[in-house]
Amino acid sequence: LAKFLNLPFYDLDDLIVSNYSSALYSSSAEIYKAYGDQKFSECEARILETLPPEDALISLGGGTLMYEASYRAIQTRGALVFLSVELPLIYERLEKRGLPERLKEAMKTKPLSEILTERIDRMKEIADYIFPVDHVDHSSKSSLEQASQDLITLLKS
């Protein structure tokens, strides 16, 4: 999407690793486990605050914008687009990829369905645009190009 839109791309998990990794922690999951939820969220917000001000596409973790400091940092950057996916597809992806550490931690106090519903509701509440991507075939260049074009049309409306 960033290539099609000709924008810089930032992946927040990659930025966490490049800013906070060490000999002991080489992935965002390891950093999350070592730092805990609150400190990890503070790290995310700090990174978002330090990104260059130009237009960019920023990939956030599913729980990032549940934290007010991260939301404030991203809110000033421009349009917030929620790339929405229906719950059954989210469950399918989580089953294939495994649960992120933040979800594992949150599931100590709430069921997964409640956590995901809260996240989706939050995104629907704060997003400037909601763009469904259930139908996008990520292995098809034409599908990705069509989705990118549809998103551009949405942003211009």
Identify the residue ranges that each predicted region occupies.
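Phosphate/pyrophosphate-binding catalytic cores of soluble transferases and nucleic-acid-acting enzymes
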Residues: L12, Q38-K39, E92-R97
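A non-catalytic, amphipathic alpha-helix used as a structural packing/dimerization or gating element
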Residues: K39-R46, E114, E118-E125
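Short glycine-rich anion-binding loops that position phosphate/pyrophosphate groups of nucleotides
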Residues: G62-L65, E86-P88, V136
